[in-house]
């Protein structure tokens, strides 16, 4: 999976898909009442990027729906997976549940069109703080209450704070997410700091967990990876996805002889909740 990083304005969807992304990551901010507000990152952000692009969440979700709805003039068939980087820092452990409910209702209304022929992309809820696991509980509850529990088949989960894997598993279980129930595990650092500085130890532990008989992870992705050497290192470590500001770099690496016969770009027909076994 080539995961386009920080796609916060609608026009950037085409920009990143044109460069080779089959997945995008979008930042979502929240107000003091736990209501999502904008698709917005703000400063600081990755080097070589403008940090202030934004849309109102409703507007972005409407544009995203069009980009992932077959038959729409804006449809991009390559775009199969969307990661919502949920900026829950201003939420408390008690308001996280409310935030999840409100975001679930918002997705149902603006992305899934009330469950009637909305966008088809798979969705990952990515949360930076393990203490906010109740966001997931609230999100699931909102869809169940609305009578659209079936849409949870399209929803996966990630904690992005580089926490201990055992603690991450516990937080997921507290949220009502079973082991290997649509679980992606991220690991990474801003591109302003070399990925060599962070190293790949935790990535390798996550891959080992994914491949073990008693793990909790379905897929592993590494962020934010823009340099050719770092892409190769991540692929060699066995990741399923690479989050990047430069999708074309990942495309070029995948076309190298070492990887060409072994790896390919995922399509909509590839279930992102199934662990890949080569």
From Swiss-Prot:
Q: Which Pfam families match?
A: GDPD_2
Listed disulfide bonds for this chain? 45-51, 47-192
Q: Where does Mg(2+) bind?
A: 25, 27, 85
Q: In which tissues is it expressed?
A: Expressed by the venom gland.
Known catalytic reactions: an N-(acyl)-sphingosylphosphocholine = an N-(acyl)-sphingosyl-1,3-cyclic phosphate + choline; an N-(acyl)-sphingosylphosphoethanolamine = an N-(acyl)-sphingosyl-1,3-cyclic phosphate + ethanolamine; a 1-acyl-sn-glycero-3-phosphocholine = a 1-acyl-sn-glycero-2,3-cyclic phosphate + choline; a 1-acyl-sn-glycero-3-phosphoethanolamine = a 1-acyl-sn-glycero-2,3-cyclic phosphate + ethanolamine
Cellular component terms (Gene Ontology): extracellular region
Give the UniProt subcellular location, in the record's own words: Secreted
Instruction: Give the co-factor note.
Output: Binds 1 Mg(2+) ion per subunit.
The biological process GO terms on file are: killing of cells of another organism; lipid catabolic process
Q: What is its EC number?
A: 4.6.1.-
In which domain of life is the source organism classified? Eukaryota
For this protein, the record's InterPro entries field holds: PLC-like_Pdiesterase_TIM-brl (IPR017946)
Active-site residue numbers: 5, 41 (nucleophile)
Show the GO MF annotations. Answer: lyase activity; metal ion binding; phosphoric diester hydrolase activity; toxin activity
What is the enzyme's class at the highest EC level?
A: lyase
Function of the molecule = Dermonecrotic toxins cleave the phosphodiester linkage between the phosphate and headgroup of certain phospholipids (sphingolipid and lysolipid substrates), forming an alcohol (often choline) and a cyclic phosphate. This toxin acts on sphingomyelin (SM). It may also act on ceramide phosphoethanolamine (CPE), lysophosphatidylcholine (LPC) and lysophosphatidylethanolamine (LPE), but not on lysophosphatidylserine (LPS), and lysophosphatidylglycerol (LPG). It acts by transphosphatidylation, releasing exclusively cyclic phosphate products as second products.
Similarity section:
Belongs to the arthropod phospholipase D family. Class II subfamily.
The identity of this protein, by name, is Dermonecrotic toxin LhSicTox-alphaIV1i
* Species per Swiss-Prot/TrEMBL record: Loxosceles hirsuta (Recluse spider)
């Amino acid at each position: 999976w080539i995961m386009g990083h920080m796609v916060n304005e609608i026009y950037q969807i085409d920009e990143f898909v044109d460069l080779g992304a089959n997945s995008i990551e979008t930042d979502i901010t929240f107000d003091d009442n736990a209501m999502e507000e904008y698709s917005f990152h703000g400063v600081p952000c990755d080097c070589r990027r403008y940090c202030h692009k934004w849309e109102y969440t409703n507007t972005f979700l409407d544009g995203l729906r069009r980009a992932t709805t077959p038959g729409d003039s804006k449809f991009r068939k390559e775009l199969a997976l969307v990661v919502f980087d949920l900026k829950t820092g201003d939420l408390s452990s008690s308001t996280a549940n409310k935030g999840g409910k409100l975001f679930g209702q918002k997705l149902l209304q603006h992305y899934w069109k009330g469950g009637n022929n909305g966008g088809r992309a798979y969705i990952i809820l990515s949360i930076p703080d393990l203490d906010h696991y109740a966001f997931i509980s609230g999100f699931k509850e909102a869809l169940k209450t609305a009578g659209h529990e079936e849409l949870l088949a399209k929803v996966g989960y990630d904690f992005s704070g580089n926490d201990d894997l055992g603690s991450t598993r516990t937080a997921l279980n507290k949220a009502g997410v079973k082991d290997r129930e649509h679980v992606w595990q991220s690991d990474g650092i801003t591109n302003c700091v070399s990925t060599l500085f962070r190293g790949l130890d935790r990535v390798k532990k996550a891959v080992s967990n994914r491949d073990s008989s008693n793990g909790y992870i379905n897929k592993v992705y590494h962020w934010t990876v823009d340099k050719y050497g770092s892409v190769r290192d991540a692929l060699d470590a066995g990741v399923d996805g690479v989050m990047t500001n430069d999708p074309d770099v990942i495309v070029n690496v995948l076309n190298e002889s070492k990887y060409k016969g072994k790896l390919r770009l995922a399509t909509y027909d590839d279930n992102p909740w199934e662990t890949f076994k080569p």
